[in-house]
Structure formats: C-alpha cells, structure tokens
C-alpha cells in the first residue's frame, strides 16, 4: 500500500474527551502491535471492515508514561485526490500500517502503554463516519487547503498568460511570492496555505523555459498546457473536500 499523507497534532486531553461522541466508527478498526516500551515504538494496524474504499482516517493516540503522565495526540492520514483517482486507497478487507515513535518527556520516564482509536474515517464515495467532529473537520480543512493552493497556481498562471510580460514563468512565480506576503485574515480557520509548498511551485514556474524545451513547445504553449492540468487538479481537489457525514 502506498504511503499516506500524514499530519500529527497534539491535543489537550480535556478537549479530546469533550469532542468524542457516542457514535462509534464502524467501518474500520485500529490495533496497536509491535509495542516496544524501551524504544517508545509501536505499529498501528488499520483494518477496513466496510464494503467501501477508505481514502482518509484520523487516529487518536493515547500514550501513558511510567510516571503516570498521559499524552494525547492525533494522526491524520489522507491518500489525496490524485492517488484516489488512480484507485489507490485502503480497500475493503485490507490492512494499512503506520509506525509510531513516541518521545519521552524526560529521561527515564518510559512509555508503558499506547492506545490508538479511530475517530474519523472518510470513504471513496465522500461519506464519512466520525466519533470526533473536530477530527473530521481537520481532514476537510486539509483537503480544502490543498485545493486552495492549487487554485493559487491556477490564478498565477492565468494572470501571467493574460499579461504583457514575455517572461511568463517568472511572472507567475512573482505573483505567487507576492501573494505569500499578504497577511492571512485573522478569522481564517484550518491549516491555510503552505508557504514551503507554494515557494516550490514558484520555483517550478521559474523553470518554464527548460520545461517548455523538454516538451518541444513555446513557453506560452507550455504554461497553457499546465493551466489546463492545474484547473483539472483544482476541480478534483475541491470535489474531494466535499465530505458528507453518514447519519447514525
């Protein structure tokens, strides 16, 4: 199975307990195996017991240390729109594995137990189950952020092609870098734009002359092709972020 895109979050214990609801995730199970207390390592096995492909899930991780300290965190995994479109997902009857590495808060305070609970699962038909609404919201926010970043590239290339500059790739790159300097609204939610990723996209557009040459087209033709590809990707990601929670 291909590696999922993973994010980790530290959660306050009270908040985690408050967000959990009575509706359990029924489509999959999580089991901790290969636990090594000395190293603080373990493997989480996620089994898809539903009849649908799973494209994302969120795990609540509870770690107990020797000195009775309890840490709670969340691991979110998502196959992403492109991989899912290629049929890559956690298929029915399939088991996915994820390695955990827990760091002790201080020397000698070793890990005594690790518990993993599935708190949100998203299926390929865009429906979802969740016992933690905020965990499901974070999956939606992650997917929405990806769509927003691709749309930023679409806007940059569109503006470059509509302008008068002959250096189209550099123009698109500058538009992206200027956009990154714009402060994010204070009431914005979710992870927002990844500055590192968008700088990577800007660097990609700066290489437009080389990329166009490799396709044996002009720079304008190359960016026009890329615009079509990016528009399709943005639409795919936007649809991917539209998740419906299953009743019950």
Q: Whereabouts are the PLM-identified features?
A:
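Short, hydrophobic/aromatic beta-strand segments
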Residues: 53-60, 70-74
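Intrinsically disordered, low-complexity Pro/Gly/Ser/Thr-rich segments with frequent PxxP/GP/PP motifs
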Residues: 67-109
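Asparagine-centered strand-capping/turn motif at beta-strand->loop junctions
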Residues: 45-53, 63
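Charged, amphipathic alpha-helical linkers/stalks
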Residues: 130-183
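A eukaryote-biased signal for long
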Residues: 169-248
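Low-complexity, acidic Ser/Thr/Pro/Gly-rich terminal tails and inter-domain linkers that flank the onset
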Residues: 20-43, 49, 58, 148-152
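Sec-dependent N-terminal signal peptides
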Residues: 4-14
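Short, surface-exposed ligand- or partner-binding patches at beta-edge/loop junctions that are enriched
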Residues: 106-125
């Amino acid at each position: 199975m291909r590696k999922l895109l993973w994010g980790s979050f530290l959660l306050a214990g009270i908040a985690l307990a408050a967000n959990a609801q009575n509706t359990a995730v029924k489509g999959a199970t999580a089991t901790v195996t290969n636990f090594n207390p000395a190293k603080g390592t373990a493997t989480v096995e996620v089994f898809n017991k539903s009849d649908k492909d799973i494209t994302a899930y969120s795990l609540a991780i509870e770690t107990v240390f020797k000195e009775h300290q309890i840490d709670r965190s969340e691991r979110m995994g998502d196959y992403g729109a492109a991989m899912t479109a290629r049929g890559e997902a956690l298929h029915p009857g399939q088991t996915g594995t994820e390695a955990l590495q827990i760091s002790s808060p201080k020397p000698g305070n070793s890990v005594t137990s690790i518990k993993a609970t599935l708190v949100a699962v998203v299926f390929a038909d865009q429906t979802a189950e969740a016992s933690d609404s905020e965990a499901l919201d974070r999956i939606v926010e992650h997917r929405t952020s990806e769509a927003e970043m691709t749309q930023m590239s679409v806007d940059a290339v569109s503006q470059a092609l509509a302008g008068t500059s002959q250096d189209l790739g550099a123009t698109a790159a500058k538009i992206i870098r200027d956009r990154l300097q714009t402060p994010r609204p204070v009431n914005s939610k979710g992870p927002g734009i990844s500055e590192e990723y968008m700088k990577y996209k800007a660097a990609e557009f700066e290489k437009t002359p080389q990329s166009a040459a490799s396709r044996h087209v002009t720079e304008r033709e190359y960016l026009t092709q890329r615009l079509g590809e990016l528009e399709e990707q943005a639409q795919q990601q936007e649809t991917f972020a539209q998740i419906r929670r299953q009743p019950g």
